[in-house]
Amino acid sequence: MSALFLGFGLPSNLFGSAPADRPITAEASQIRIFDGETLGLGDRIIRLSGIAAPARGEACGSDAARADCGAAAAAGLAALLQGQDVSCRIEGYDGFRRGLGRCIAGGRDINASMVEQGFALASISVLRPLEVAARDGRHGLWADASLMPAEWRRR
């Protein structure tokens, strides 16, 4: 009898849980940028895993030269995704129940690219060499070290 039941089989996502290895994808027109590490793919909110970018409105620099480093990081992410479809594999969830994902656009690893271009810090060891190269090359937010958010300067 169990063979008969198994023969009919129920879809594994019957109750809304997609298989863990299925990526979440969105066409370019369905992508929203919230900040330098968070994007919307259709109705899903994804935080890029393994990186930390300044939040929108996070001021950096001296009193004489204030800048919105969060807006710069968001603009960096928008430039990477410009006109491209995105696919993300969810690796877990954060405290806000956002999916933590590794994302690809145009064959490019977006998480690594944000670090490589100097718009995010590496929070996993495999990306640290990219962070060092961005800092040494003064890319992105590293271009003017006096403008870095305080927590970045402590690293």
Question: What residue ranges belong to the model's regions?
Answer:
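Small beta-barrel nucleic-acid-binding modules, primarily SNase/OB-fold domains
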Residues: 1-155
